[in-house]
């Protein structure tokens, strides 16, 4: 990978390692105490539009074209709260559903303290759920506050 430095003498650059599996390729990026795992689904490039585009990279299960998960170094990916999902309808790990929708969407999820920020695009009407181990005090979708609908570790978003 080519990384552009901000200054010629900059030494603190991200460390990257390639990974791959059946029908997916990926990158693990380590930088400043944070790990970001990025996966590209080689089956979900728009040629297949049905159940054959599911992949299982590193314990995750998704039909997204691309997804990323970020978590602090020294913790496990399954406890991550920050996600990027490109053109996907679900993200699961084991028996846990982290994201579920009847339509393929583009999603960014960022949890900070007791606040959950979501950016969702891809459909005019949204009906989806997101995993949260604790009920957040506030939820914002596309910079607009919405009522918190929380049940059984899932936040429901309907727009």
Predicted regions and their residues:
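Charged, amphipathic alpha-helical scaffolding segments
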Residues: 2-4
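Non-catalytic terminal regions with compositionally biased, polar/charged low complexity
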Residues: 6-158
């Amino acid at each position: 990978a080519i990384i552009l430095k901000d200054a010629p003498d900059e030494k603190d650059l991200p460390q990257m390692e390639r990974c791959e599996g059946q029908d997916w390729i990926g990158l693990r990026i380590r930088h400043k105490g944070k790990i970001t795992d990025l996966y590209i689904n080689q089956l979900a490039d728009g040629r297949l539009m049905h159940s054959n585009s599911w992949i299982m990279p590193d314990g995750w299960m998704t039909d997204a074209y691309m997804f990323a998960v970020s978590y602090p170094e020294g913790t496990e990916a399954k406890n991550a709260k920050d996600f990027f999902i490109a053109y996907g309808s679900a993200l699961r790990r084991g028996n846990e559903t982290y994201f579920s929708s009847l339509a393929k969407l583009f999603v960014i999820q960022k949890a900070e303290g007791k606040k959950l920020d979501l950016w969702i695009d891809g459909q005019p009407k949204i009906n989806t759920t997101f995993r949260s181990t604790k009920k957040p005090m506030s939820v914002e979708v596309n910079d607009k506050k919405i009522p918190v609908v929380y049940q059984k570790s899932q936040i429901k978003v309907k727009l």
